[in-house]
Amino acid sequence: MKETRRKRILLTGGGTGGHLFPAIAAAQQFCREYPGAEVLFVGTKRKMDAETLERYGFKGVAINSYGLKGKNMRELVKALLVLPISCLQALFILARFRPDLVLGVGGYVTGPVVAMAKLCRRPTLIHEQNSVPGLANRKLAKLVDRVCVSLPASASCFPADKVVFTGNPVRENLVALAAKAREVKEGVTLLVLGGSQGARSLNRLIVEAFVGVGSESLAGINLIHQTGTKDLAWVKQAYGDAGRDVWVEPFFKDMDAVYSQADILVSRAGATTLAELATLGKPVILVPYPFAADNHQQKNAEYYVQGGGALLFKESELTAPQLVEAVISIATNREQRERMEFNQRRLAPTDAAGKIVAVCRQLINRDEL
């Protein structure tokens, strides 16, 4: 009979908030269902990942790892040379932590960690957030025990007998925020999110829309603008020169406060942001990042547009006057806004974190037989 001990789950992935936040949501649910569970994140050396994990009370370690896709020859050689080191580091972490299960959430760091976990005969599963799977998850699907998917379109990319449709998990603080009654406030507030890396072209469009020719029609709309670090200074100056009072930050750490203020959003189409907006019932104007791998942001966006919760524009075709018109059409038409809010909530993932942990439980129980 095996000795009873606290369950241990190792999660791996990261490099963007889109990978990290679903992992945090799954970890939170795992700790609820397994009181006293030990959780370890294995990720990249990105400072923002470490700060985010610390804010949510989780421990993380980093390994040396580089992406393979879309690299020039020099970068590709570097990534391949580092890969054996990544695998050795992963083996060392696995030997020390001895997890009951390993969950990969995508990103290049996932590859060596999940592959080594399989070599160590640990139960493994991956979670895919996007409509078009990333390279790491496509390759790992052949090795792992289960594949959890967020959007229906990605299911066909994986072995059918391994796929479980779970949806994309949302952090518990945002689920709690969605359950709160909305405050009655003056005016309409637009929130602009360019993704965790910011978005220069999107920033330019927003600034032109709010301070350029024709911006008078947006005078009654409050604006909150996440710029990313590189564009912060000039965006702030542009609003200041125009006498526009705008809440501008490179990144928002307290997304609860920001989301609670927002009535409408302009955003990229990362899968995790979309799941959060659907949970909160926020109408959104989507401008997918045109250089996303396999055009996955466009595919993500189409799911929410078809469901009636979003409007969609290609960055290459969108002009500031068109953006102004789209914002005004939602801001001034309460019926349309409420319809989009309803549709967003209808598209929201239902207990995605619980479904992922249910799969974890099945694999752990099977391994203990």
From Swiss-Prot:
Subcellular location: Cell inner membrane
Catalytic activity reported: di-trans,octa-cis-undecaprenyl diphospho-N-acetyl-alpha-D-muramoyl-L-alanyl-D-glutamyl-meso-2,6-diaminopimeloyl-D-alanyl-D-alanine + UDP-N-acetyl-alpha-D-glucosamine = di-trans,octa-cis-undecaprenyl diphospho-[N-acetyl-alpha-D-glucosaminyl-(1->4)]-N-acetyl-alpha-D-muramoyl-L-alanyl-D-glutamyl-meso-2,6-diaminopimeloyl-D-alanyl-D-alanine + UDP + H(+)
Membrane topology: Peripheral membrane protein
EC supergroup of this enzyme: transferase
Gene3D superfamilies: Glycogen Phosphorylase B
Main subcellular location of this protein, as a coarse class: membrane
GO CC terms of this entry: plasma membrane
UniProt pathway annotation: Cell wall biogenesis; peptidoglycan biosynthesis
Source taxon at top rank: Bacteria
Protein name (Swiss-Prot/TrEMBL): UDP-N-acetylglucosamine--N-acetylmuramyl-(pentapeptide) pyrophosphoryl-undecaprenol N-acetylglucosamine transferase
Origin organism lineage: Bacteria, Pseudomonadati, Thermodesulfobacteriota, Desulfobulbia, Desulfobulbales
Encoding gene, per UniProt annotation: murG
